[in-house]
Amino acid sequence: MDGRRRAVARTAAAAFGGTARVARYHDADASHAVDLLACSDGDADGLTSYSTVTLHTAENRLDGQDIRVELAAVAPTAAERFANALATGALNVMKDGWLAAPGVVFRGLLAADGVTHDLPHVLWVEPVTWPQLGTVEVPDGPAVHWLQAIPISESERRFLAAEGFFAIERRLEEQRVAFWDLSRPSTV
């Protein structure tokens, strides 16, 4: 990893706490790869915090601006396929130009990787668990903005489409959703 990527990894590891490790994930034909940091025992027993640490090298265009991002999440350590799903989302941004921004949903991401069928989609939000990762200046390049994955149900996705991002965000906050609980009931 070059210095910029190391700085991104160190920043995420410091925010997460716990024991850190980095693994590389490739797409099916090994033409693209993303490095993913996993930190265990930092947030709570039985949970692992994840962050991509090399996605910021890929363009992410929002309203004509290139907003560099990393994707983060918290999930039960026992959900072994969760890291793969997060890496798949990052590879979709890198390879296929998917937009990663607050309010955007990656449909079916968790179901496709066999993580959960109850909450198959990922809603991207500002990093509520780690506010210090909102916007981070790192050496030799543009600022990096972290987004946090919130697993959502199909009915929550439809509610978001009908009522808007702020309505679903408010609903999730009011009901104090444990966003790391991959078997939680839907709020809608």
Could you describe each region identified by the protein language model?
Residues 1-68, 72-188:
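Acidic, proline/glycine-rich low-complexity IDRs
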